[in-house]
Amino acid sequence: MKKKQNRVAVSVFMIIGLVLLRGSASAGDQPVLMMATTTSTDDTGLLDYLEPHFKKATGIELRWTATGTGKALALGRNCDVDLLLVHDPEAEIQFVQAGHGVNRHPIMYNDFILIGPPADPAGIKGQSAAGGLAAIAGRRALFVSRGDQSGTHLKELQLWRAATPNQPEKEAWYVQTGQGMLSTIHVAAERSGYTLTDRGTYIKYENTQGGKPPLVVLVEGDERLRNQYSTIEVSTTRCKKVNADAARKFSAWMAGPQARKLIGDFKLLGKQLFIPNAEVR
């Protein structure tokens, strides 16, 4: 039976949960793959959708914990998982270069978007990402950040650096939730603020609101907003007990024709959440 962990900070409780899952995995007859992934692949329902197809194709049971990319990479460094599915290319490359992971493969992408109230009090609609954030800062309009070192949060900080020399973390109008993307969107909606989200999670949120969300897309299409997801196998040199075979099979399956079609067909409200772009291996 597939198990996924609650989206919480890396803590004693998360590590204990992963140890227990790994122990139960070794107790059964079928192979189990332990994966750490970003919240967006979980919040959107993508992994629930893919998991039974992967198990049928390979006989491997997929179990995952969903957290921010920074914390997912930490789980990989600590040898608590076999594989990562994450979306911060710069941090991923550093992870591999440091010897913690091997075989980083792009799998799919979508984009980041700036969303906010339809009235758009900061006047950001149609601007570039940097221009939109500069306008938010200039108007001191409420901005809600994940503040959790996730891939989305790190992208947001990168965009702020391009937008203004004065970083917003200590400003009263800048709120950090320390939570996942869906929860952060809900906080922004409750307070009529702006936030940065990946498009897939926004479509999921839009779906939960019956197609009429209180926050709308205001900034999109900037080339800086591309959001690439990749798999990384945890290094067996650093982590002797990882299930390297299962990790390789999942990575290869995600790049193959079946998963590419499934990812491309995965839609809510008739909208595609992720675009497959893996090179078939």
Give the residues covered by each predicted segment.
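Sec/Tat signal peptide C-region and signal peptidase I cleavage site
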Residues: G23-A27
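Serine endopeptidase catalytic core focused on the charge-relay Asp
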Residues: L114
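Acidic, polar ligand-binding/catalytic clefts
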Residues: L83-Y109
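Bacterial N-terminal signal peptides
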Residues: S11-R22
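Bacterial N-terminal signal peptides that target proteins for export
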Residues: K2-V12
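Exported/periplasmic ABC-transporter solute-binding proteins
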Residues: G28-E61, T65, G70, A74-D80, ...
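Short connector loops at helix/strand junctions that flank enzyme active sites
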Residues: N78, Y109-N110
